Amino acid sequence: MSESKDTTEVNQEVNEKASSQSTKKQINFKRSHFIIILIVTILVTAMIAVFATIGISHWTSGLNSDQRDEMKKVEQVYQTLDDEYYKDTSSEELGTAAIDGMVKKLDDPYSDYMTKKETKSFNEDVSGDFVGIGAEMQKKGNQIQITSPMKQSPAEKAGIQPKDVVTKVNGKSIKGQPLEAIVKKVRGKQGTKVTLTIERGGQAHDITIKRDKIHVKSVEYQKHGDVGVFTINKFQNSTSGELKSAIIKAHKDGIRKIVLDLRNNPGGLLDEAVKMANIFIDKNETVVQLEKGKHKEAIKASNDASKEAKDMDVSILVNKGSASASEVFTGAMKDYNKAKVYGSKTFGKGIVQTTREFEDGSLLKFTNMKWLTPKSHYIHGKGITPDKKIEEPAYQSLNVIPSNKTYQLGDDDKNVKTMKVGLNVLGYHINNHSTEFDSELEDALKSFQKKNNLDVNGTFNKSTNEKFTQQLVEKANKEDTVLNELLKKLN
């Protein structure tokens, strides 16, 4: 038997195929034809994106006369080519090409078809521990885009940023390739390296990343003075339970102000986003709305809000890497004035996909609805604007300098300005931020190289670039000026 899984996509999803007679595995939030299914966490060993998935079951058996006529023609073309083409043909490849053509005709970057082999690879990626680079990716239009790098992951340490566009893997173009195939290229054994060519700000950069074992922690709690900070990395199984337990503990410790840090949280299970909102939002209040055509259904909180959570002043911290289930949760909290939202605008993903699995193990995913906040805000392509904007430091938005580029005295290039800004932030004083590689920059580089046990030559080469990028990332993580600014407001 084939399976069907209805899924909501707040970033990107992977869906499963179905034959006309399929058994459904789903999570019912209420008794109706609206069903929510767990979103698939596509952790590409570079990690793809995690997205909550929702769907409406509107499947009827059989085809109408027009549909039968069209399918008969497709069958005739398939049979003719398979039997009579002058070269040997593959029945499987012809069938796959026909399906790919139908999906491509939708002109929808979030609808896709995966073969059995691709599906197997996808299923292997759905776990909390995996070997990869720790970056979540999605297909946006004809581009492969980074949704967000995971905190402390090899990708983040190498300088990968949200909305970076991946154009090549190991020097080979990935144009036109399905997301799952690209994921396979990025994957590999622990300790091996992969080079991604990314575009950011109109410039292309090669970034080499060492694959490592990635463990996805769901909730981390730290006390900062009188404020409890809960870093929520992903919405996975038991995230809501982990957060509720941590809040109870914080309440016992006397904490009455909390920050829910959703920065670079790409999403995850919609079910967990709803349950997490239910910690703060009372029973029978709408958490998210599902809409398809004229059909609209509200998914509501099923329990009373936590008494400890009710006793707390809540702030939510987001950025452009906050997507999918993060936005479902933030949108609900914002609509009910349960929290003030700080940071920068979120990613913006508000459409829903359904997944279908066929008997041969292949998968089909297609968009079938959208989701809205309790007050009917549609955030797709727009994101959620924070109540109070807190800008990230300029150096955190610097373009990564390609690892295959070398610069020396006398060069004039935009990347030279990046070096000057970055070195200045790292404590190597430079008076100007021009694009000219001058003697002042050369002296600063020599000091940097000497301090970091590199060859002291004043040239910006690959080894210098790697250490330069690593230290900027470490500085951003250590200082966290955005969080510190928020804590000053709250303490």
Curated annotation (Swiss-Prot):
Belongs to the peptidase S41A family. Pfam families: CtpB_N-like, PDZ_6, Peptidase_S41, PG_binding_1. One of its GO terms (molecular function) is serine-type peptidase activity. Residues 9-22 have a biased composition (Polar residues). Keywords: Cell membrane, Hydrolase, Membrane, Protease, Serine protease, Transmembrane, Transmembrane helix. Its EC number is 3.4.21.-. InterPro entries: ClpP/crotonase-like_dom_sf, CtpA/B_N, PDZ, PDZ_6, PDZ_sf, Peptidase_S41A, Peptidoglycan-bd-like, PGBD-like_sf. It is a single-pass membrane protein. Residues 119-201 form the PDZ domain. It comes from Staphylococcus saprophyticus subsp. saprophyticus (strain ATCC 15305 / DSM 20229 / NCIMB 8711 / NCTC 7292 / S-41). Residues 1-22 are annotated as: Disordered. This is Probable CtpA-like serine protease.
